[in-house]
From Swiss-Prot:
Lineage, broadest ranks: Bacteria, Bacillati, Actinomycetota, Actinomycetes, Bifidobacteriales
A single MF term (Gene Ontology): arginine-tRNA ligase activity
SUPFAM superfamilies from the UniProt entry: Anticodon-binding domain of a subclass of class I aminoacyl-tRNA synthetases, Arginyl-tRNA synthetase (ArgRS), N-terminal 'additional' domain, Nucleotidylyl transferase
Reaction(s) this enzyme catalyzes, per UniProt: tRNA(Arg) + L-arginine + ATP = L-arginyl-tRNA(Arg) + AMP + diphosphate
Protein name as it appears in the record: Arginine--tRNA ligase
EC numbers: 6.1.1.19
Gene3D superfamilies (UniProt xref): Arginyl tRNA synthetase N-terminal domain, HUPs, Isoleucyl-tRNA Synthetase, Domain 1
Organism of origin: Bifidobacterium longum (strain NCC 2705)
Amino acid sequence: MSPEALSELISSIAHNLVAAGQAGALTDELIPPVDKLAVMRPKDRAHGDWASNIAMQLAKKAGMKPRDLAEPFAAALAEADGIAKVEVAGPGFINITLDSASAAAVVDAVLAAGAVTDADKHLNKVNEYGRNDHLGGQTLNLEFVSANPTGPIHIGGTRWAAVGDAMARVLEANGAKVVREYYFNDHGEQINRFAKSLVAAWAEANNLGEAGYQTETPCDGYKGAYINEIAARVQAEAESDGVDLTALAHQDQGLNDDGEPLGEADTEVREEFRKRAVPMMFDEIQKSMKDFRVNFDVWFHENSLYADGKVDAAIEELKSRGDIFDKDGATWFESTKHGDDKDRVIIKSNGEFAYFAADIAYYWDKRHRAENSADVAIYMLGADHHGYIGRMMAMCAAFGDEPGKNMQILIGQLVNVMKDGKPVRMSKRAGNVVTIDDLVSVVGVDAARYSLARSDYNQNFDIDLALLASHTNDNPVYYVQYAHARSKNVDRNAAAAGISYEGADLALLDTEADGEVLAALAQFPSVLATAADDRQPHKVARYLEELAATYHKWYNVERVVPMALTDPETRGDDEARKALEIAKNPEPARAAARLKLNDAVQQVIANGLDLLGVTAPEKM
């Protein structure tokens, strides 16, 4: 019997007690929905397999003492199939012990779950166990990473790549349609600074300092070997296309008929660098994401909001709702009407759009697209955007939407890369930062994704490179993957020994270690649902670590394959073999049941790792 089945049983009993007049003043309307009646795993196994606080939840509403209400609940539970014992403890806890067959039913539930319909999209051989449809019918637009196209993706963006894709997988496993989206900031001042930095690198490489070109990186520009690389690539591409950058540079130096400068010395050549370099960075970012196993459905270009008139249209929409006014020569969004701490400029007095104007248009576009319009727009932003939440939520409300429902903003905190207790600055291309490609080259995709997804994104996080590269139990990803590989090895040894679980009697899974593994397996569906509802994919990783620990402990105390057939230390010594066979080897029926349990663990670990975008290895 699963925890969910127990919750449904408890809910049914609550309604029956109301009907029978055994629940005091409690009415059907006062009974919480089933998902609010979750059972818990007691810390002390002497208190049973599961515990419920239903009596304490409802006692005040019933006008009864918790223990007095718990007694009829316990009596009804004790009559249910699959329950061996029920006790009322403490102030009103109800402790439930399942019979061995009922507890072991989860094994069949895991292995009988059908294959996923989109198997080609999954890393591992996953099935439907744990998956549900409680978010079905919703289209969620999940925007993440969205790093500026002015350099390689740094470690902060890498964290969002791992967390965002894991979150998308978790949401999809709960029935939602998820649109993974990358917002490509190819409009605005950061692009100008990028182009200026490239021109400076090009000018220095071509000795154009004497011609009036700045050869030093602007103080607000971008540095790193990648700038020199891209500048050289732009020059080579331009020359291949018959464009003479030096000639453009001289053209920039031209004067008008009055002998006055036509403009900044690098206007034309800077535009040439911009239009060529931004697509180069776009291609590089796309490749980094693909190599990191993150496949976006939409690559949205900020520039298109202006080119397609969407910024003007969104502002007109807000104006029609009475939320736009003019002051001091500028156009303002009256965001204070909707909870913001101050009103926001959207068109500056010089006629230029403020950055927030694009944000307004972008949200409106997400919600009203011809295809895949978002019921919920989820933004995953860095810690430096915390002050942006108020104006974004105000804008959501101004459009008639519900902040927190139609728009959700998740803030991620900083990541530090450490080795031997010291911060690491290992990028040769990007200067004083760590990039996604740097991290992957050192620890691999699996370790990078798992380590970044296993921690709460709302907390600062240190990555220990030495730990992630190690093959020890202290390395979380190794520990979980090894559990899967170990279970595969059990299968191979069982096959060699002629052991099969066909027709296995799962009621024989009656030891304490068996029970711990069974309970862990039973919790996966609720963990997956909670991870989706809370937007916290790290809960899947932490669950996998607990399951792996439980499995490793079980493996060490409960044999599946006879030791004499697999352990080198028993070979060639008949007496030793006999002694070990008597002491360690299970009878065939129990071995079959344990093999089936082994394979259920294997399946759940494969399912869970797949949700994190991490492989489940056959061998290690």
